[in-house]
Design a protein with these regions (language model features):
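Acidic (Asp/Glu-rich) sequence patches and key acidic residues
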Residues: 2-195
Length: 195
């Protein structure tokens, strides 16, 4: 019996269908993103700028300012990566296409060609938004990976994006840049989430 039931005599209904939905918060948007490899030099420069900026603005209570990233010189949209190709590539690797996404913890939105979409495993979400028939942005969220099968699916999926589409992964939270055409780099990065 829940707290509301005890205090107010209310019956709360938990919708178990919503529990496994891919979920992201607004602050996570493109924080760990997959982008064209042509952006590598720009990203390496940005990482150095971020490191200098954090040294200047760090205090014992956090930071005194916010770093605003510039747009990438080679946006994912310019690669004309088709939605149908992208989704087929990922679902063939064993990920599931979501019909809905939980946004900011409570809002549930339907996936469509004009909204954010997700393809996921229980421990890994690959989000993307679209413009017409093409992928606009790709970003991920990863939780604790406890299955060897899931670990291998994620490695193979990210590697396929690196090999077939020459993509790289940038984690702006930790300033980690991963060449997705290098399985060793992918595995090393994912070990942060492995249990």
């Amino acid at each position: 019996m829940g707290l509301l039931n005890k205090i107010f005599g209310c019956k709360t209904i938990t919708n178990t269908e919503d529990k496994g939905l891919p979920s992201f918060w607004e602050d996570d948007y493109c924080q760990i993103e997959i982008v064209p490899g042509k952006n590598k030099a720009h990203i390496e420069t940005a990482i150095k700028q971020i490191e200098k900026f954090t040294e200047k603005t760090r205090t014992e209570n956090g930071f005194t300012d916010i770093f605003i990233r510039e747009s990438l010189p080679f946006p994912t949209l310019n690669e004309e990566l088709r939605i149908d190709y992208f989704e087929k590539l990922l679902t063939e690797k064993g990920l599931q296409k979501a019909k809905q996404i939980r946004y900011d913890g409570y809002t549930i939105t339907k996936c469509s060609p004009t909204t954010s979409n997700a393809i996921s495993l229980p421990c890994f979400n690959l989000f993307y938004d679209c413009t017409y028939l093409f992928i606009n942005n790709i970003w991920i969220s990863t939780t604790l990976i406890t299955s060897t099968d899931h670990f291998n699916i994620i490695v193979d999926t990210l590697y396929e994006l690196g090999e077939s589409s020459e993509m790289i992964l940038i984690n702006w939270n930790s300033s980690e840049l991963i060449d997705l055409a290098d399985k060793n780099q992918i595995k090393q990065y994912l070990m942060n989430y492995w249990k």
